């Protein structure tokens, strides 16, 4: 058995042979996967998942570990994830999706400090600010809103550990 990895991660490159490809281009990933006769493709980062890499690989008949483009929306949009949780009855922090600073300030008034401001777009884990400083929270919200289509999720602060899990499932149980 051998491991083929996307070039650019020195730790992974020590474990297998590295290839250069555009991880955001589903066709390029499929081309490289088929030329290497891979048995499984693992897609971890959010951006390639949102770009539909897992769908393209799966459509070509290669098993893939990673959610579909539709499922990746849960990571791509915090407001979408909040809506899915609400629709499914999953307990989560109270939150407001805001597209204007007036809405942000009203959410701050309603929820109080500490302020939790989450960029609604992909931010590679760097789109969240938790602070008791309202000016800092407002500054982050303003920066997120300044982009085309910008939105932020302002939510109640929950104290406790955060856990992220990657799991295998058989699709049935």
Regions found by a protein language model. Give the residues of each.
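Conserved ATP-binding module of the ATP-grasp superfamily
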Residues: 91-93, 110, 114-117, 130-168
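Short beta->alpha connector loops
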Residues: 24, 46-48, 98-102, 158
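Short, intrinsically disordered, charge-balanced linker/junction segments flanking boundaries
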Residues: 1, 169-173
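Short, well-ordered alpha-helical microsegments
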Residues: 49-51, 104, 162-163
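ATP-binding N-terminal substructure of ATP-dependent carboxylate-amine bond-forming enzymes
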Residues: 1-70
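Short acidic-hydrophobic, aromatic-tinged amphipathic segments that line or gate anion-handling sites
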Residues: 18-25, 96-100, 131
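A conserved helix-loop-beta module that forms one wall/lid of the active-site cleft
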Residues: 67-127, 134
């Amino acid at each position: 058995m051998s491991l083929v990895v996307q070039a650019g991660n020195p730790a992974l490159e020590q474990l297998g042979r590295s290839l250069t490809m555009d991880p955001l281009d589903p066709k390029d990933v499929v081309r490289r996967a088929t030329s290497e006769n891979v048995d499984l493709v693992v897609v971890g980062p959010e951006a390639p998942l949102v770009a539909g890499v897992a769908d393209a690989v799966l459509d070509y008949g290669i098993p893939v570990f990673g959610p579909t483009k539709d499922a990746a929306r849960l990571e791509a949009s915090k407001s979408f994830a909040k809506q899915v949780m609400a629709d499914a009855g999953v307990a989560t922090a109270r939150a407001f999706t805001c597209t204007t600073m007036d809405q942000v300030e009203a959410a701050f008034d309603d929820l109080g400090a500490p302020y939790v401001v989450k960029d609604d777009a992909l931010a590679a884990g760097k789109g969240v600010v938790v602070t008791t400083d309202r000016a800092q929270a407002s500054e982050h919200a303003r920066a997120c809103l300044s982009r085309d289509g910008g939105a932020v999720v302002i939510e109640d602060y929950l104290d406790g550990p955060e856990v992220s899990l990657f799991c295998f499932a058989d699709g049935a149980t």
